[in-house]
Amino acid sequence: MSVTLIDINDVEVRLYREDGKVFTSPGVVHLDSDGMLFGADARARLRSNPQGGFDKFWSQLDEVPVAAGPRGIRHHADIAYRHLQHLIGEHGPLKQVLFVVPSDYSRAKLSLLLGIAQALQLEVTGFVDNAVANLACRTLQHQTAQFLDLGLHRTCVSRLEINERVRFASSQTLERSGKNHFGDIVINWIADCFLDQARFDPLQDAASEQQLFDQQDGWVNQLRKSAHINVGLEQHGRLHEISLARDELIRALTPAFTALAAPLAASADVVLSHHFAIYPQELLSNLNAKLAGKTTALETVMACVPELLSTANEVRLCRSLPHATMTAGRNENGS
């Protein structure tokens, strides 16, 4: 039976099939009287109609009552159920699945996720630690490594022990260091640029604020490659245009990225999750870190599926995988 991987991160949930196809959905749901919107459609309303937006249901997966939730939505677990149900409807049918989960997911969250999956008639064959999966196929210089997993609301710093296997050792959650925090910094910086250059404040109008929110990642990614870019936002039929400079973006984000460096050890390899890839290299270089490939963890887990399948009706959390580069090196040496 084929296995589908489901990678849980509130930036985006990813489905990865054995044929290498990847399907993604931002970890956002928008609820209103007309029903539910998911993923990109929900994200497109987060700033223009924020009251109905939910983006913490994966990072805070629990059964704490949601205030003013619509009928049938009691808590974050209900919203996560609907999001997974939507993904299955779009890209299913799914039967046998393996979940790749953040290192800071508690037993309570894993238990809830298992219950949600079983309610959706999914056969869960196991859970795999995301940090372990990302480092298992990397060439590393030290016996200790740290993996920074960027989420919407936090960055999880995992410490791993490296020998013939990659083993999870511990994790630390850095609050106010997630993609939303970086995004708020970027949005405020760009808004200041519009005020200075075009005498236009995009944050004073819900529609233009939503435009800015939608465009920010693309503009940051462009500045990763270019020293300057020209951008524009439209309001009431008028286009406001300005120039953005990479040096100024780096200056705006440097304090936030400096805070990420605080828990990092000098004697450890540091690897960043692929969600950091949109930011300028100068910011990443300050962390003395390397980027993980976009599908590195998923490819690694898929290659290890026989080892990861749970038996005897016990669904296990795997926090240790063979270090592929170590194994390859030993094979090349004939041992």
Regions found by a protein language model. Give the residues of each.
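Conserved phosphate-binding loops in N-terminal lobes of ATP-dependent enzymes
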Residues: 11-100, 223-227, 231
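Structural motif
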Residues: 7-10, 100-104, 149-151, 272-279
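Gly/Thr-rich phosphate-binding beta-strand-loop-beta motif of the actin/hexokinase/Hsp70
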Residues: 1-32, 137-169, 186, 216, ...
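Helical "lid/coupling" subdomains associated with nucleotide-phosphate turnover
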Residues: 221-334
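Conserved, well-folded catalytic cores of nucleic-acid-processing
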Residues: 60-67, 86-90, 119, 189-197, ...
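Active-site neighborhood for divalent-cation/phosphate handling
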Residues: 75-141
